[in-house]
Amino acid sequence: ASQNVMFIADVRTAKIADLVVTRDNSVADGAMANTLQVKVTDANGNTLAGQTVSVLADNSATTAPTVITEPDGMVEISVTSQTAGTSAVTASINNSSLSQSVKFIADVSTAQIAMLEVTQDNAVADGAMANTLQVKVTDAFGNALSGQTVSVLAGNGATVAPTVITEPDGTAEIPVTSQTAGVSAVTASINSSSQSRNVTFVADVRTAQIADLVVIKDGSEADGATANTLRARVTDAFGNALAGQTVSVLADNGATTAPTVITEPDGTVEISVTSQTAGTSAVTASINNSSQSRNVTFIADVRTAQIADLVVIKDGSEADGATANTLRA
């Protein structure tokens, strides 16, 4: 006669026999899961159903703290995360444990401009020296996104590459040049996300020049007090106004003027010239190797007209009512 006998797996020797990654590289959106399969057996390799396996995941990943094995001794572990990178998942039972790493990737579908900051400002407006900004692109959960194309615009005539590509840390440098002094708004955008920052370009004092010299008042009296006036304008090589520049001034034909004048914020300065000598005076304004000249005219002051001299040039004429003595005033 025959009888069947049954042997059961030894739960006292339950161990993690295997831990295998079955799905990897899920998006770090807190919803899509990486998965692993754990197998529990006894010391002799017999599968164990209904065993509680403890699970831990690092790097801020989320998983159920325990899972229960199926009749085949297997159970699936789901792991989600909002943090891109590697997470070590550990399954343990009794004193037995195994670990495997899974990887979460940043979500390119939610790419956004997380940061735009000025890293160098106040460059010279010479079309070569650059102001720089750094842009950072992340997903909705702040994970850096590499290889992303960021569109860039700059206002006020500044020049910038139309696009930049992010590095592995999600950042990219944006150089901006200009020949126009002043403020330029730089805007970086990706998808529907954008940020703007202002950078400032300054006029190039190294190329200061007399851009213009204009007579604004002429024909003053040569009384040493009433002035003819001119306006000088100083710019750099690209026509940007230069404030605070010292302009040297000369006036000939005995006219008097301050030897230097300082430009105002708009790059202009008024030059006053007086004289006690009627006639034309050439006024020259210069800075560096640049100069311009203009003529101003001083007129005699009729208000102070006087007999300067009276000289007899013919005397002793006959008293015939016709022959004249003459004088010159």
Protein language model regions, located:
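The feature marks long extracellular or luminal low-complexity segments
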Residues: 1-328
